């Protein structure tokens, strides 16, 4: 079985939001390689005019800094974060959006090929050889299914808004379009199905709704080699208070 981890999917969402909404208020990304996290936490304290280097002894300061982080960083108010480190901790945020591992519908077969690079790494290598060998891994084809959750209750606490939700849908639909590489080939989204509830606490269990979407190989197809080899069946008979939305 092939796996796409939750952190892989969230990384691609973060990357899309960063490039698509660069400079827009509230769309900064906390989890990236520009600065140490503790430095960003201290910057939050300074932006709020709070006393620094108290190591979380002032609970009000931690709360104010946490709210500042949620307001300014899309990924924190979306996915949550543990920010309890350093001299200026910002507490812990439970994110309203959670994503499961993506799992392949059918078993996949990872393959490996050998490549040659027409350059050497060091001067000492140059005396002995002109090329270097490398390897690339790939999967000929695989269809993966992942499920996720949006908690309206937790969204109220982090400030995750309807506008943020639309940005999330856009990011999920387009995240692979700006992340192409030879190894991932034509990786793309094929379906995005949303169950929208009428109440904050939900109108039906998520497992019941997920079961309404099934994926199967087309009749006569033994080994799937493309999206066209599959059929997606959707039971559109929704429980009361649940609306089915097909974003793709």
Question: Where are the regions that the model predicts?
Answer:
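RNA-binding basic/glycine-rich loop and surface signature characteristic of RAMP-family CRISPR effectors
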Residues: 1-248
